Amino acid sequence: MSLPPDHLDAVARTVHEALRAWAAAHGQRDIPAWDEAPDWMHASTRESVRHALEHDAPDGRTQHDQWLSQKARDGWTLGPVKDAAAKTHPLMVPYDDLPEWERRKDALINALTRALV
């Protein structure tokens, strides 16, 4: 299922803000509001929404695998901290190695997307 660009952006914005709140509740406060987020973050969220629409998976495994592939294509690597300039991220690991809250976040992307379309 594909969405018109304006609908895709509306869903992506809502998913982004929900994930931002989820992350903040788990101590991760480095995700800016949608209107202040860089273009690469918008693109990443749109891609996550597209993926959720194309893959009806209840858990977040395929969502994480998609994110991991996207980051690797964009030159990101595993690193001890999230650093956009250095393109390192501590969550560039297999799904089974993610903290539980991160696995639940990936499933949340799928559930939110389906609820919003």
Language-model segments: which ranges?
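Alpha-helical propensity feature that highlights long, continuous alpha-helices across diverse contexts
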Residues: 1-117
